[in-house]
Amino acid sequence: HRQAQSQRARTLGMLLLPLEADFSIPLRRAPNVKEACAEAYGVGEEPSVVSLRELLGVIGAHEWRKKGVDIPVLGDRIHPHYGVFSPVRGEYIGLVAEAPLPTMKLAFDIGTGTGVLAAVLAKRGVKHVIATDQDPRALACARQNIARLGLLGRVEVVETDLFPEGRAPLIVCNPPWLPARANSPLEHAIYDPQSRMLLGFLNGLAAHLEPGGEGWLI
């Protein structure tokens, strides 16, 4: 099964489709992918080509962004953007929703992505959550989700590499789990080259925890 999947991925990666500057596909009966491509790539400037594999990923990300992912503990949906990890499998969210909280005062969410864990902590009653990321896609995604959930007064989204300034009694992190280099922006959310983020979190945790604080690696 894995071999068949790998072969399919290679085949889709070798098939190239033309895109006009406005992201239209100049082929008969081609679908309209303008909005999906604009969300993924920004403003088009010149004609280009894209692999079918990449384009299918762009379309899939667009659909997830439109309909969102249901998060039962929030009683609402999270809308992931292209290149930002989608919380489709929510086991780790359940852990954060149920684990005893050491504080209701302050928490850091490192590598927030969609902002889902920051939102869960805020919904549980943490008064101030600082959610960090350095990826522009993730920052925009988290800010939109936090605003839509009505949590702007409790969750602050900050652009920084790993930790914000200061210390907190609770620091959570759900890093990408594959220690390899991503082949496309769509894969960026699940790859951590040379475990850089994981090691950075572990090595910097003690310096950013308050005495007696807790770090949750999820």
Language-model features: where?
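Conserved SAM/SAH cofactor-binding pocket of Class I
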Residues: 89-173, 179-183
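Soluble or luminal CAZymes and related metallo-dependent hydrolases
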Residues: 4, 119, 134, 193, ...
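Glycine-rich S-adenosyl-L-methionine
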Residues: 185-210
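N-terminal auxiliary segments of SAM/dcSAM-dependent transferases
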Residues: 1-69
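Class I SAM-dependent transferase core
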Residues: 53-101
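Conserved RecA-like P-loop NTPase ATPase core
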Residues: 80, 146, 174, 201, ...
